[in-house]
Amino acid sequence: MIAIIDYGLGNISNVTRAIQHLGYDVILTCDDKDVQKAEAIVLPGVGHFQDAMHSIEEKSIKDMLKNIHDKPIIGICLGMQLLFQHSAEGDVSGLELVPGNIVPIQSSHPIPHLGWNELKSTHPLLQSDVYFVHSYQAEMSEYVVAYADYGTKIPGVIQYRNYIGIQFHPEKSGTYGLEILNQALKGGFIND
């Protein structure tokens, strides 16, 4: 079973359908007991970082996620950004699970970064075109396992311990997106 954290901001229905299409049972929850029983946890998200953190803190999700070390926690789009320490969007702290910060995209290309872009990575699964919609990005770091070139390097997938971030929308990225999501649910793209 996959637990999708329902904190009130997210692309829950599309992500739920994608995970079910991969053959998993899904539960929408904020309950610690459900999360403890899950094989993996997904934190989806669309919207403003500050609003998301306010909702997460109201529902005591931050402490719950900080205590999980034995299964993948996957953040998608805004959910990936929430995994980090701080965001310039609203100047607010994140979940502080992954070192680094979220900053505005600095590119000569139009913002938001909207549409299909090719991932670049040494991992064979992470070399495909995927669908992005965002104006903020994680800073480049040693935790980036795939990036897109948008006049600047945009982290597309990060992994730090059991935390996996996917900046693009795998549920909207066709067959490759589903394969990437499935690999994340199984534990990710690097071996510790």
Curated annotation (Swiss-Prot):
InterPro entries: Class_I_gatase-like (IPR029062), GATASE (IPR017926), Imidazole-glycPsynth_HisH (IPR010139)
Keyword Lyase: yes
CDD domains: GATase1_IGP_Synthase (cd01748)
Domain Glutamine amidotransferase type-1: 1-192
Alphabetic keyword roster: Amino-acid biosynthesis, Cytoplasm, Glutamine amidotransferase, Histidine biosynthesis, Hydrolase, Lyase
Pathway(s) this gene product operates in, as recorded in its UniProt entry: Amino-acid biosynthesis; L-histidine biosynthesis; L-histidine from 5-phospho-alpha-D-ribose 1-diphosphate: step 5/9
Matching SUPFAM superfamilies: Class I glutamine amidotransferase-like
Domain of life of the organism encoding this protein: Bacteria
Active-site residues from the entry: 77, 169, 171
Protein's recorded name: Imidazole glycerol phosphate synthase subunit HisH
Keyword Lipid metabolism found: no
NCBIfam families linked: IMP_synth_hisH (TIGR01855)
GO terms of molecular function: glutaminase activity; imidazoleglycerol-phosphate synthase activity; lyase activity
Catalytic activity, reaction form: 5-[(5-phospho-1-deoxy-D-ribulos-1-ylimino)methylamino]-1-(5-phospho-beta-D-ribosyl)imidazole-4-carboxamide + L-glutamine = D-erythro-1-(imidazol-4-yl)glycerol 3-phosphate + 5-amino-1-(5-phospho-beta-D-ribosyl)imidazole-4-carboxamide + L-glutamate + H(+); L-glutamine + H2O = L-glutamate + NH4(+)
Primary role: IGPS catalyzes the conversion of PRFAR and glutamine to IGP, AICAR and glutamate. The HisH subunit catalyzes the hydrolysis of glutamine to glutamate and ammonia as part of the synthesis of IGP and AICAR. The resulting ammonia molecule is channeled to the active site of HisF.
EC numbers, comma separated: 4.3.2.10, 3.5.1.2
Pfam families membership: GATase
GO cellular component terms attached to this protein's record: cytoplasm
Entry's Gene Ontology BP terms: L-histidine biosynthetic process
Localization per Swiss-Prot or TrEMBL: Cytoplasm
Location, primary (coarse class): cytoplasm
Protein species of origin: Staphylococcus epidermidis (strain ATCC 35984 / DSM 28319 / BCRC 17069 / CCUG 31568 / BM 3577 / RP62A)
Subunit and interaction comment: Heterodimer of HisH and HisF.
